[in-house]
């Protein structure tokens, strides 16, 4: 347990920030999961934008590093492009 007043305050602040960061990360994971579940549907581009927004928000708040956000955004966009291309090929073969 913290002994000094400043150490007690730092412990409280750390607990608050941890709770806030957990909330942001949870909503980020939810947005990404919903996008991945919607791949191949007409809602995928809309959910991709929501995932991008969540990633940008988390990066701007310092919850995740900006390069991590950029990497995840690139991978999500690549997944959408791959799914869209697969749909186009399937439609052309029919």
Curated annotation (Swiss-Prot):
List where the protein spans the membrane.
none
- Which key words tag this protein in UniProt? Ribonucleoprotein, Ribosomal protein, RNA-binding, rRNA-binding
Matches recorded under InterPro entries: Ribosomal_bS20, Ribosomal_bS20_sf
Which GO molecular function annotation, any one, does this entry have?
small ribosomal subunit rRNA binding
The Gene Ontology biological process annotation of the record reads:
translation
Q: What Pfam families does this protein map onto? A: Ribosomal_S20p
Q: Which GO terms describe its cellular component?
A: cytosol; small ribosomal subunit
SUPFAM superfamilies recorded for this chain? Ribosomal protein S20
Query: Which Gene3D superfamilies does the entry link to?
Result: Ribosomal protein S20 (1.20.58.110)
Q: Which family does it belong to?
A: Belongs to the bacterial ribosomal protein bS20 family.
HAMAP family, per the entry: Ribosomal_bS20
Q: What does this protein do?
A: Binds directly to 16S ribosomal RNA.
Name assigned to this protein: Small ribosomal subunit protein bS20
Q: Which organism is it from?
A: Symbiobacterium thermophilum (strain DSM 24528 / JCM 14929 / IAM 14863 / T)
For this protein's source organism, the top of the classification is:
Bacteria, Bacillati, Bacillota, Clostridia, Eubacteriales
Query: What gene name does this entry carry?
Result: rpsT
